[in-house]
Swiss-Prot record:
Cofactor note: Binds 1 Mg(2+) ion per subunit. Binds 1 thiamine pyrophosphate per subunit.
Organism of derivation: Chlamydia caviae (strain ATCC VR-813 / DSM 19441 / 03DC25 / GPIC)
HAMAP family documented for this protein: DXP_synth
A Gene Ontology molecular function term of the record: magnesium ion binding
Cofactor: Mg(2+); thiamine diphosphate
Enzyme Commission numbers on file: 2.2.1.7
Binding site for Mg(2+): D149, N178
Stated name of the protein: 1-deoxy-D-xylulose-5-phosphate synthase
Assembly and interaction partners: Homodimer.
One GO term describing the cellular component: cytosol
Keyword annotations from UniProtKB, A to Z: Isoprene biosynthesis, Magnesium, Metal-binding, Thiamine biosynthesis, Thiamine pyrophosphate, Transferase
Pfam families recorded: DXP_synthase_N, Transket_pyr, Transketolase_C
Reaction(s) this enzyme catalyzes, per UniProt: D-glyceraldehyde 3-phosphate + pyruvate + H(+) = 1-deoxy-D-xylulose 5-phosphate + CO2
Length: 644
């Protein structure tokens, strides 16, 4: 990159600085921003392809509108990196985005006045924008929801579309269409519109008419602005009317999302229109990075130290340890062969949930419904009702959106839908909108629901296979971390498991430790550290949060009066809550120390520091255990350790 290019970005401290530059310089700025994002994400990881594709669009928005006076509402928010660079956040904090001391990977009001909402989930921007438009309808404020094409598959977006009033003014919907979702659906429409809108004779005619109208004394400018609505009506006589017009949105586009001059012109026109408008912008996801343009889904999100060079992309790399999603993807392929009518359903998360192999192997039994979590669950219920086994693969944080569907269409009907709840636990780099730490709270309350979590790869495979035979609603939750491969207790992947049966992993005398899922490893580590203090612990994997193994724990509590519970879930409504209900029901009097996620929102961070922040690191827990139970070590002459 040249020093000239570098100097442009360094001169941007706020969006108003954009006005200092020519169109040619703004194009150089886009190049610099692209280079900056690639360079930073090579070190930090993050959402790559979507941010590379929206740079020129973001520059044009900030050039025409004011993000402090007008309201920019980014749907999802993971495509806001260019927005951050233009709003005073081109700092060392940007260089550590998604990490300790760095910026959030999403819009965040705690960072900047230019960010209106904490974001992370898709489809809500239009509803939020309509609410703000209603509250500010008498002001000069422009409301600009910025949606990706995938957001238009969300039911929430369609509900919002149905509530748009033609009386709205200063309401501009920006549709960033990067060919990842609805493009095929509107392909014929877009081709007709594009052919008509960009026809030289029509554009020449339109310009002459508008120029003539502006010359009318007193009313010319007003009539000219309204002539745009007339031109849209004329186009509708010759080509299909865009669906957006049926929802009181005047359609403008398609517009090349990488042509800054054209974008600025279109936004300036839309700014002065007295009715709601949708601007359809075509962008290229991964723009400027060839490997990302060729495979935008793969490079939607990247890990730190990803290889951005196409020439070197086939260099050998160290193969990471298999994660729980990897185990899930492999296991469902095996189950797909054993169960010839097994269906897998996912709401737009096939790659993240490692379902590409199943999709390729069994294309007729793999269904990606798009960003429609509620539909995914209810669709799965329909498959189950038709007597076919079905697994609905869904992220914990997105399952929130399907709560009623789980209750009404699965549990109430008693249908054997298996919910494979991915990303259960802290989301680390993604932060508070993505932590999967609330699902137990609402799933526990639902009758007929079995809830379990594996501690190892073997137990995970056992649960997946066994659950297909339970004939009831099941939730199997698991994190996106390396799966424990060696399990001395569970060795046979084909062993059948019955609901509600826990396992003792290690015997002791002084304290009982329950670890949920992968936290069993932490519990065993704590046991070893407690041994150095002369404290002997029994470690148990309940496996099932519901039904809880009342028989096993009734026996264990006859010999233990001190209990420790460790879970990577909110302290409200998780394993500890189930255990406390058990204690109350059976009138056990024991001292319980609970380690979980405190009742607060936690921002992004590196794994070790975030675990320490919430009190789930081993060192912090051991200190608290020793203090809470007032453990002190004594060594008898026989070297036998006793606790007083």
């Amino acid at each position: 990159m040249t020093s000239q290019v570098s100097s442009i970005l360094s001169q941007i401290s706020s969006p108003t600085d954009l006005k200092k530059f020519s169109l040619a310089e703004l194009s150089l700025l886009a190049e610099q921003m692209r280079h900056k994002i690639i360079s930073v994400l090579t070190n930090t990881g993050g959402h790559l392809a979507s941010n590379l594709g929206i740079i020129e669009l973001t520059i044009a928005l900030h050039y025409v509108f004011s993000s402090t006076e007008d309201k920019f509402i980014f749907d999802v928010g993971h495509q806001a990196y260019p927005h951050k660079l233009l709003t005073g956040r081109n700092t060392e904090e940007f260089d550590r985005i998604r990490h300790d001391g760095g910026l959030s990977g999403f819009t965040s009001p705690s960072e900047s006045i230019h960010d209106l909402f904490f974001s992370g989930h898709a489809g809500n921007a239009l509803s939020l924008a309509l609410g703000m438009a209603k509250a500010t309808e008498d002001s000069r404020t422009h409301i600009l929801p910025i949606l990706g094409d995938a957001a238009f598959s969300c039911g929430l977006t369609l509900e919002a579309l149905n509530n748009i009033s033609s009386n709205l003014s200063k309401f501009i919907v920006v549709l960033n269409d990067n060919n990842m979702s609805i493009s095929q659906n509107v392909g014929v429409m877009s081709k007709n519109l594009s052919r008509w809108i960009h026809h030289p004779k029509f554009n020449l005619f339109s310009r002459k008419i508008e120029k003539w109208l502006t010359k009318i004394p007193r009313y010319g400018n007003s009539i000219s602005r309204r002539s745009h609505k007339l031109s849209i009506c004329l186009k509708s006589l010759f080509c299909p009317i865009p669906i957006f017009e049926q929802f009181n949105l005047a359609y403008m586009g398609p517009v090349d999302g990488h042509d800054i001059k054209r974008l600025i012109s279109v936004f300036q026109t839309a700014r002065d229109l007295p009715f709601p408008v949708l601007i359809h912008v075509y962008t290229t996801k991964g723009k400027g990075l060839e490997i990302a343009q060729e495979n935008p889904e793969k490079y939607h999100g990247v890990t730190a130290n990803f290889n951005s060079s196409k020439e070197n992309k086939f260099l050998p790399t160290i193969k990471p340890q298999l994660t729980y999603p990897d185990i899930f993807g492999q296991t469902v392929c095996t189950l797909g062969e054993a169960f010839p009518n097994l269906h897998i359903v996912t709401p737009a998360m096939s790659l993240g949930s490692r379902l590409e192999a199943f999709k390729e192997k069994f294309p007729n039994r793999f269904i990606d419904v798009g960003i429609a979590e509620g539909h995914a669950v209810t669709f799965s219920a329909g498959i189950a009702k038709a007597k076919s086994p079905v697994i609905c693969s869904i992220y914990s944080t997105f399952l929130h959106r399907a709560l009623d569907n789980v209750f009404h269409d699965v549990c109430l009907q008693g249908l054997p839908v298996i919910l494979a709840i991915d990303r259960a636990g802290l989301a680390y780099g993604d932060g508070c909108s993505h932590h999967g730490i609330y699902d137990l709270s609402f799933l526990r309350a639902m009758p007929n629901m079995v809830i379990c979590q594996p501690r190892s790869a073997v137990v995970f495979q056992q649960l997946l296979q066994s659950s297909l035979q339970w004939n009831m609603p099941v939730a199997i939750r698991y994190p996106n971390i390396a799966a424990t491969q060696r399990d001395p207790i569970a060795t046979d992947v084909h062993m059948h498991r019955d609901p509600g049966v826990g396992e003792i992993l290690s015997q002791g005398e002084d304290v009982l430790i329950l670890g949920l899922g992968h936290m069993c490893n932490t519990a065993l580590s704590i046991k070893l550290q407690l041994l150095t203090h002369g404290i002997s612990a029994t470690v148990v994997d309940p496996v099932f949060v519901k039904p809880f193994d009342n028989n096993l724990f009734s026996i264990l509590l006859m010999h233990h009066s001190k209990v420790i519970i460790i879970e990577e879930h909110s302290i409200r409504g998780g394993l500890a809550s189930e255990f406390n209900d058990f204690l109350a029901t059976y009138s056990f009097k024991v001292d319980v120390l609970h380690f979980g996620i405190p009742d607060a929102f936690f921002a992004h961070g590196d794994k070790e520091s975030l675990l320490k922040r919430v009190g789930l690191d081993t060192e912090s827990m051991v200190k608290r255990i020793l203090t809470h139970f007032n453990f002190r070590t004594k060594t008898s002459p026989s070297n036998k350790l006793s606790i007083v």
